């Protein structure tokens, strides 16, 4: 099957066998119902075993799955009256980041997120979800607007990273990311950041300075891709699987390290298996987080955000 992952092969082979037996059972005089039921029970156990023992590399593949739900997919199910806003008022409109105003269960909010494409044409239009500086500046414009009008900010993170092209550098890519971090640190409204797929380096951080940060169960968050890390460390990108295990990039790793505030469960096999069910899990998390953060004063929100990031990391003195 297209877009299926290597670690799922045993599941797919067994599913194919069950499908063949069911087809044969419909046209044959031989009753294979018992055999089919046994295989279906075996399939359930196999799925439980494989999906509960996924490696970091397995999860990385799920996070990159071409059918994985995007920011706009979730916006359509989670928010009402979404109105997309465009442009950074400086250079242009970057389709790799989408954002606008909406309501969440009656509460006015600003929603911003990276947006990957659904096919080749769309990916070219969206630059594969890798923003230029104008994308980050558009996001900051919307965040400042939210701060002015007292709207909570909800960010969806899903990018390989900021676009590393020449034009992006000429227009101040690093400054745009740094400016977002600087300005977000002093926002007087709640900021919730959710990694829904791949959280790649500075491109992810530019939407990631939240009061609370959550990750989907199979999402990843890292300073560099496993392929890039392997190429730098061992001069061999084919060792990406080894790098993924060493880098501690999974939702479980980051929660254990105290970088994120929670893990959002995924449907069996990954978010792409059931968009509606996955959106409901995100709905629960946003509801709980908003309820907690909206009880904070403006000063408490700024202080909590500052303290959260101050605690991240380790340093030594000589």
UniProtKB/Swiss-Prot annotation:
InterPro entries attached to this UniProt entry: Acetyl_CoA_COase_a_su (IPR001095), ClpP/crotonase-like_dom_sf (IPR029045), COA_CT_C (IPR011763)
Coiled coil: none
UniProt subunit comment: Acetyl-CoA carboxylase is a heterohexamer composed of biotin carboxyl carrier protein (AccB), biotin carboxylase (AccC) and two subunits each of ACCase subunit alpha (AccA) and ACCase subunit beta (AccD).
Catalytic activity: N(6)-carboxybiotinyl-L-lysyl-[protein] + acetyl-CoA = N(6)-biotinyl-L-lysyl-[protein] + malonyl-CoA
UniProtKB keywords: ATP-binding, Cytoplasm, Fatty acid biosynthesis, Fatty acid metabolism, Lipid biosynthesis, Lipid metabolism, Nucleotide-binding, Transferase
CoA carboxyltransferase C-terminal domain residues: 38-292
Localisation per UniProt entry: Cytoplasm
HAMAP family, per database record: AcetylCoA_CT_alpha (MF_00823)
Official protein name in the record: Acetyl-coenzyme A carboxylase carboxyl transferase subunit alpha
Protein source organism: Listeria innocua serovar 6a (strain ATCC BAA-680 / CLIP 11262)
Physiological role: Component of the acetyl coenzyme A carboxylase (ACC) complex. First, biotin carboxylase catalyzes the carboxylation of biotin on its carrier protein (BCCP) and then the CO(2) group is transferred by the carboxyltransferase to acetyl-CoA to form malonyl-CoA.
Nucleotide-binding listed as a keyword: yes
GO MF annotations, alphabetized: acetyl-CoA carboxylase activity; ATP binding; carboxyl- or carbamoyltransferase activity
PANTHER family: ACETYL-COENZYME A CARBOXYLASE CARBOXYL TRANSFERASE SUBUNIT ALPHA, ACETYL-COENZYME A CARBOXYLASE CARBOXYL TRANSFERASE SUBUNIT ALPHA, CHLOROPLASTIC
GO annotation, biological process: fatty acid biosynthetic process; malonyl-CoA biosynthetic process
EC number: 2.1.3.15
Gene Ontology, cellular component aspect: acetyl-CoA carboxylase complex
Record-stated family: Belongs to the AccA family.
Pathway info: Lipid metabolism; malonyl-CoA biosynthesis; malonyl-CoA from acetyl-CoA: step 1/1
